[in-house]
Amino acid sequence: MERSPAVAGQFYPADPEELRKMIEWCFRHELGPGDLPETNDGPCTLPGVVAPHAGYQFSGPVAAHTYKVLAESGTPETVVILGPNHTGLGSAVATMTDGAWRTPLGSVEIDSEFATALVRKCGVMDDDLTAHANEHSIEVQLPFLQYVYGESFRFVPVCMAMHDLQTAREVGEAIVDVAEELDRNTVVIASTDFTHYEPHDQAQKKDRKVIERITALDEAGMIEIVERYNVSMCGVGPTAATIVAVKAMGASEGELLKYATSGDVSGDYSQVVGYAAIVFRRG
């Protein structure tokens, strides 16, 4: 089956040409990397990245940092996108094992072999369309991936409503096991925003503590900081699972490419959402 886009026309333009223009606006924005990426068609050398998932007018320039570095690091066969479940619907950890997701830029095929093996390997994961039908956190990553890679990749969506350490480790380890079994050149994307609806300075301070743990590849420490400082980061589980996966794939460090808040775009610093672009590199 083909999943229809849930947030086209809201989070990003529904018209293909307008969407391409907006993605290019994100890359060239003063908060973005400044120029368009040149995609490397060799195997991807990055094991994973972190990208935000708000409306493109707010978080798109930050996301563009992630996708520029990713594109220039090579072209993966399979992209596993881990996003939080905002709707509360469906299984607590859900993938889809067949079909495609449509965006204004075309359809992206699910890597059915990978997703099916993942459900078999990971005891907490179900094959469940309901969790994905109206969720935006994974969908908004696809147009960026389509812009830089065209139709050269397949993907696996993983929507998470569970954010505990044990679940994150189970999911992250299963992703790596399947990638190795299938010999897939795989990149893992954690889709997350950081602090929600707090003053800019307060959001920055909280988010800096969390990002320090992410770039140190410390999934347990990240969860502990989120809990201790009551950080309203939505993608805790997806980010923790991504850290687990990239460490097993040989990552030695994470690098913060860009941090900004919605206030940096809108000029309203009273109630902001934090966004970060992070890449994980092998040693």
From Swiss-Prot:
Disulfide bridge partners, by residue number: none
Origin: domain of life: Archaea
Signal peptide limits: none
InterPro entries from the UniProt entry: MEMO1_fam
Family: Belongs to the MEMO1 family.
Protein name per UniProt: MEMO1 family protein MK0963
Source organism: Methanopyrus kandleri (strain AV19 / DSM 6324 / JCM 9639 / NBRC 100938)
